[in-house]
Amino acid sequence: YTNSRAEKRVNDRIAELEIESFLPLQKTLRQWSDRKKMIEKPLISSYVFVKALPKDIYTVRKIDGVVKFISIQGKPVPIPEEQITNLRILCGSDAEVQVSTDFYAKGDLVEVTVGSLTGLRGELIRVGRKHKVVIRIIQPGMNLTVDIKTNAIRKLEKNEDI
């Protein structure tokens, strides 16, 4: 994971260290008031994929612009080679690709899974910015709304009630 708009610079520095990396880029037409230009822009903002040995991880983390590795319990998570191959195919095609991280939609029934509100269920009423959502929690005699991060909720299955 990189600082915003630092993907190309980070990818170049990793390449200088002779460590294999992949920055999925997509060609897109950018329009200014006076001209149009075809530019290459990262397909997934703030991500550079690195095929690093354990000894290289610290070296990569020290690169200016690198924020962190995707990790679980402090250990970097490997991305399956098949997924990287699929990204390479997408980037090599002429298809216009749009990346969406919104897995929730207005009206979804959700349950809070983290924090002091764990177990509360409600209806998602707004998907906001920065991975936040607003949910309406219906309790007897009350109608509450709560701002909460998307990683603190789960979508209820169709057979689950609020």
Task: Give names to the regions the model predicted.
Residues K130-K132:
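A generic structural signal for beta-strand entry/edge sites
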Residues T113-L120:
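Short coil-to-beta-strand transition motifs
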Residues L120-R126:
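Short beta-strand-centered aromatic/proline hotspots
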Residues Y1-L109, L124, V134-I162:
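Acidic-enriched and Gly/Ser
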